[in-house]
């Protein structure tokens, strides 16, 4: 099996989502040359055929476009997960770059501004990704790349578990909608426990949205099924709430590091089916 690796190329973000696990070093992103080395490492391993760019907010890496273009030129299937709020800024996201992605993933936890602000899914001016901006972004992406797949990621917490987002699926033709039960995360004093949601409330959210996307994917547990490389080029192990470093892709071959990662092959296969 060839794998998808999630490159968290920056931890910089214009949002401060209270559930987010991306609370590492915000200031010392790797250089373009270092990310090229990591991408070459993945290619040489023969184990990886797809890269997902994540963050933080990935477009905030100073060399975002160059990193994407390099990965594309190496033949990887590319996707991105973004909060969407900066994707209409051509200086950060040149529109032609949409053509390089097979999938555009957008984090959408609510379309209610009050909920989004309570979650921290807003910038310093409390501006959020409105439904109109979301629609505009999807329209732009499809105008550049008509075959691009639109995927939504919704993290279910106790702040949005009772909301109804079915209008998104009804109007925007979402190919895949991942509904993720928030994972408890503790790192360097950060703790998202106050937002934990019950299994019953999570199941209720999924049931309400079951008919509005071609592919609804509820995810209760992501443990050891998400291959994550942080903004320092390190493969992380999420077996416990405290993420641990498995090894550096700047210093070792990916295959060597991956062999030390107690990866859950079955859960991974179920996550990425289809």
From Swiss-Prot:
It holds the Pfam family Fer4_12. Keywords: 4Fe-4S, Antiviral defense, Iron, Iron-sulfur, Lyase, Metal-binding, S-adenosyl-L-methionine. Gene3D superfamilies: Aldolase class I. The keyword Glycoprotein does not apply. Its EC number is 4.2.-.-. Its cofactor is [4Fe-4S] cluster. Residues 1-215 form the Radical SAM core domain. One of its GO terms (biological process) is defense response to virus. It is an enzyme of class 4 (lyase). InterPro entries: Aldolase_TIM, RSAD2/Viperin_antiviral, rSAM. GO terms for molecular function: 4 iron, 4 sulfur cluster binding; lyase activity; metal ion binding. It catalyses: CTP + AH2 + S-adenosyl-L-methionine = 3'-deoxy-3',4'-didehydro-CTP + 5'-deoxyadenosine + L-methionine + A + H2O + H(+). [4Fe-4S] cluster binds at residues 13, 17, 20. How this protein allows bacteria to resist viruses that do not encode their own RNA polymerase (such as lambda, P1) is unknown. Belongs to the radical SAM superfamily. Prokaryotic viperin family. Expression of pVip6 in E.coli (strain MG1655) confers resistance to phages lambda, P1, SECphi6, SECphi8 and T7. Catalyzes the conversion of cytidine triphosphate (CTP) to 3'-deoxy-3',4'-didehydro-CTP (ddhCTP), probably via a SAM-dependent radical mechanism. The modified nucleotide represses transcription from T7 RNA polymerase-directed genes (possibly by acting as chain terminators), strongly suggesting these nucleotides block viral polymerase transcription. This is S-adenosylmethionine-dependent nucleotide dehydratase. It comes from Selenomonas ruminantium.
């Amino acid at each position: 099996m060839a794998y998808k690796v999630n490159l968290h190329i920056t931890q910089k973000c214009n949002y401060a989502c209270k559930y987010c696990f991306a609370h590492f070093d915000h200031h010392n992103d790797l250089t373009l040359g270092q990310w090229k080395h990591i991408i070459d490492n993945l290619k040489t391993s023969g184990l990886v055929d797809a890269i997902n760019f994540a963050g933080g907010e990935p477009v905030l890496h100073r060399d975002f476009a160059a990193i994407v273009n390099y990965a594309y030129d190496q033949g990887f299937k590319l996707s991105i997960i973004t909060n969407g709020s900066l994707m209409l800024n051509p200086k950060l996201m040149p529109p032609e770059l949409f053509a390089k992605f097979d999938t555009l993933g957008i984090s959408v936890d609510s379309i209610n501004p009050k909920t989004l602000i309570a979650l921290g899914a807003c910038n310093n001016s409390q501006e959020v990704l409105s439904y109109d901006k979301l629609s505009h972004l999807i329209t732009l992406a499809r105008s550049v790349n008509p075959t691009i797949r639109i995927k939504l990621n919704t993290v279910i917490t106790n702040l949005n578990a009772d909301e109804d987002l079915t209008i998104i699926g009804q109007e925007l033709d979402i190919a895949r909608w991942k509904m993720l039960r928030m994972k408890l995360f503790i790192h360097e004093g950060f703790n998202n426990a106050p937002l934990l949601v019950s299994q019953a409330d999570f199941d209720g959210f999924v049931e309400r949205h079951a008919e509005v996307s071609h592919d609804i994917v509820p995810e209760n547990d992501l443990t050891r099924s998400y291959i994550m490389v942080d903004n320092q080029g390190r493969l992380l192990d999420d077996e416990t709430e405290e993420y641990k470093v498995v090894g550096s892709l700047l210093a070792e071959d990916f295959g060597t590091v991956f062999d030390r990662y107690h990866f859950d092959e079955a859960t991974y296969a179920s996550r990425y089916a289809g």
